[in-house]
Amino acid sequence: MRRFILSIAFGLAASSVHAADWDRFLQAVFGAAAAKDGSVCYARVYDAGHLAANKAQRIRDVAIKLTLRTENGERRLDHNVVTHLVGSRQKYWSGGQCGDYRGLVARCFVEGDGGAADFTLDSDGKTLTARFDDFHIWRPQDAADETTMTFDKSPADKVAKLTKAPMSACAGVGD
């Protein structure tokens, strides 16, 4: 009986820590708007100098939209990513849900077992560092083509540091 009570107490403590981390992450991203549904955009466009100095990098630009929504009474955080590769006008995108929060870090997964990313915020939520882990992207222009590619194949594409941007920077990321 004592073990049972201890396991319940531990579970409740872990649940409240998880809820506190969820709240802290949402507060950093959305600020006062964390109480309602909405979206925020983070973006980065790599300039020619950066790309010349990092020849192994394939990612030319990246935008990440985080969307807080309520569905069937449950709140959730979705992510959508849009990117272009160096030398290509083709747009690629990806998306899924975030589900594990540790302080200012959210673990976010791509739908259909397409990898994951850790999104780490600075304390004021103005900068997001994305660490990609076998993160899959695909082409939205051709819905019939479900071919995916791994976003972070090159070690130079494993980490991206983005800044909060106007929602127009996330145009075309899907929803």
Identify the residue ranges that each predicted region occupies.
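Surface-exposed, polar helix/loop patches in the mature regions of secreted/periplasmic/lumenal proteins
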Residues: 86-139
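Bacterial N-terminal signal peptides
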Residues: 7-13
